[in-house]
């Protein structure tokens, strides 16, 4: 009888992770993971009273802890596998402790029969107040000669003393003007005056107005002097036009990349020229070489290398990119016709040798976009705060004054010669040809209103039938007119549905032939 193979149980950690949520864990798994076994409890509660931290238990080194293995009743032990070392301090340690104890006074020894009561003596407490401060007075001698602002004392015999007190000198008044300036790199004050009437200084506007800004007729004739405009310093700055661009990164002639050893992208003898019309050539040219997924993070602005297996033939999305192994970064230039050209140099891997080398021709893929025109010069305005740009218009100054006599009114006679009836409007409104429009004039829908035969002659004009219809009931005593019916029978067709079929009248249906059955 074959013995059954023992299947090893899974690890305790993995079993605990899977069965803890379900509550089906074995007791031994829970005790081992949560450290609640008998040995764990002995270590937990026994470590409160016994410390075995320096013995190196369960370290696997066999050194016996910090003191080594010591037999009972002997001195310090020796570590296994090592020689004892004597540790000597480099400096002599100084004794740290209290001050030396003074000897007991033996002059007045205490007799054994003396009283043990010690009399109290008065002692002066510690003086906590500050001590006396020494004061030093500096005495300055009086100058011998007369000094400024010194009182003069005059003494005379037989009269009262007169004391002349000099007035107290008034110190000079100091006026301090401060101006705070905060530096703002985006704001710059231009201290400039444009040719205008007035004055300017820094950022403070000073406006000078006068009453000679208008035009006076009939007054004194003054001499008119032609003034010339004072050009500012910005007038002499001539901005040269931007030269037309020929490539995306213009390089000097001595650093030209495409001219070394006669190599050029437009050389038809060395490079195959292929014009691409697909717009993916500008953004994602790799989609023209092989089918791939979109990666919005990757920008195809570098050289793309495609690793294809030559044993397996894969049809590319575009036949012009067949067997392309490398597609370099784009280059921007201009054509002789003035168009922008995006070029990429590619390498084909058409032939592979036995050593693994791949041989292929070089292809110039390009697409012409548009032309690059020279920018028109734009007049730039000054940035910052400067005076002279604001135009202030005053009504009384800019008006025209006429010198005339107000007492005489030459128009009074001509006004009285005409009557007020000439101001009345004599136009006659005629509404005979008008029409009543119901609805909105902006509606573009056309509705056909059927015209019924009636004895009343009237015209209806309806422009929009989406409004409201108001019907007013009327009663007339008109005789009802009965029109004679024609001789042709009337065919009635019921059109209950809007399909393409119809129902015939029962009189028009084909009658069934009656037959008698024997």
Swiss-Prot record:
Major place of residence: virion
Motif Nuclear localization signal in this chain: 1-10, 510-517
Keywords carried by this UniProt record: Capsid protein, Cytoplasmic inwards viral transport, Disulfide bond, DNA-binding, Host endosome, Host Golgi apparatus, Host nucleus, Host-virus interaction, Late protein, Microtubular inwards viral transport, Phosphoprotein, Viral penetration into host nucleus, Virion, Virus entry into host cell
GO cellular component annotations of the record: host cell; host cell endosome; host cell Golgi apparatus; host cell nucleus; viral capsid
GO BP: microtubule-dependent intracellular transport of viral material towards nucleus; symbiont entry into host cell; viral penetration into host nucleus
The keyword DNA-binding belongs to this UniProt entry's keyword annotation: yes
InterPro entries with a match to the protein in the record: Late_L2
PTM notes: Highly phosphorylated.
Summary of subunit composition and partner proteins: Interacts with major capsid protein L1. Interacts with E2; this interaction inhibits E2 transcriptional activity but not the DNA replication function E2. Interacts with host GADD45GIP1. Interacts with host HSPA8; this interaction is required for L2 nuclear translocation. Interacts with host importins KPNB2 and KPNB3. Forms a complex with importin alpha2-beta1 heterodimers via interaction with the importin alpha2 adapter. Interacts with host DYNLT1; this interaction is essential for virus intracellular transport during entry.
Family: Belongs to the papillomaviridae L2 protein family.
Name of this chain's protein: Minor capsid protein L2
Organism of origin: Human papillomavirus type 5b
Encoding gene (name): L2
């Amino acid at each position: 009888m074959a013995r059954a193979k023992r299947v090893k149980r899974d690890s305790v950690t993995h079993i605990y992770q899977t069965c803890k949520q379900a509550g089906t864990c074995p007791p031994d798994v829970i005790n081992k993971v949560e450290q609640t076994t008998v040995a764990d409890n002995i270590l937990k509660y026994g470590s409160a009273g016994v410390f075995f931290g320096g013995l190196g238990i369960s370290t696997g080194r066999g050194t016996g802890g910090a003191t080594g293995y010591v037999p009972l009743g002997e001195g310090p032990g020796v570590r296994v596998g090592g020689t004892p070392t004597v540790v000597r301090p480099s400096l002599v340690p100084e004794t740290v402790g209290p001050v030396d104890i003074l000897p007991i006074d033996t002059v007045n020894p205490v007799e054994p029969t003396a009283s043990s009561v010690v009399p109290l003596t008065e002692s002066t407490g510690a003086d906590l107040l500050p001590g006396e401060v020494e004061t030093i007075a500096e005495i300055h001698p009086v100058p011998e000669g007369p000094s400024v602002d010194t009182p003069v004392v005059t003494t005379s015999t037989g009269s009262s003393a007169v004391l002349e007190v000099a007035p107290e000198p008034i110190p000079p008044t100091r006026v301090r003007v401060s101006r705070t300036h905060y530096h703002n790199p985006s704001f710059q004050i231009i201290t400039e005056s444009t040719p205008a009437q007035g004055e300017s200084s820094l950022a403070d506007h000073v406006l000078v107005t006068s009453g000679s800004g208008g035009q006076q007729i009939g007054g004194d004739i003054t001499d008119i002097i032609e003034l010339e405009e004072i050009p500012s310093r910005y007038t002499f700055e001539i901005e040269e036009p931007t030269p037309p661009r020929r490539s995306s990164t213009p390089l000097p002639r001595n650093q030209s990349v495409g001219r070394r050893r006669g190599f050029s992208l437009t050389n038809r003898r060395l490079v195959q020229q292929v014009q691409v019309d697909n717009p993916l050539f500008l953004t994602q040219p790799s989609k023209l070489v092989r089918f791939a997924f979109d990666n919005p993070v990757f920008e195809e602005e570098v050289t793309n290398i495609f690793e294809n297996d030559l044993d397996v033939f894969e049809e590319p999305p575009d036949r012009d990119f067949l067997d392309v192994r490398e597609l370099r970064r784009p280059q921007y230039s201009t054509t002789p016709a003035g168009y922008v050209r995006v070029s990429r140099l590619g390498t084909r891997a058409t032939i592979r040798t036995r050593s693994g080398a791949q041989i292929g021709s070089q292809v110039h893929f390009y697409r012409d976009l548009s032309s690059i025109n020279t920018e028109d010069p734009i007049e730039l305005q000054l940035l910052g705060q400067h005076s002279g740009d604001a135009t202030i218009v005053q009504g009384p100054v800019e008006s025209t004054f006429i010198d005339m006599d107000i007492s005489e009114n030459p128009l009074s006679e001509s006004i009285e010669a005409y009557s007020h009836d000439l101001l009345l409007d004599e136009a006659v409104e005629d509404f005979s040809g008008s029409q009543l429009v119901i609805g909105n004039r902006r509606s573009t829908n056309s509705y056909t209103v059927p015209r019924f035969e009636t004895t009343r002659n009237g015209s209806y004009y309806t422009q929009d039938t989406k409004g409201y219809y108001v019907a007013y009931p009327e009663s007339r005593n008109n005789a009802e007119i009965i029109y004679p019916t024609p001789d042709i029978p009337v065919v009635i067709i019921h059109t209950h549905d809007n399909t393409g079929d119809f129902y015939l009248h029962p009189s028009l249906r084909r009658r069934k032939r009656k037959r008698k059955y024997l």
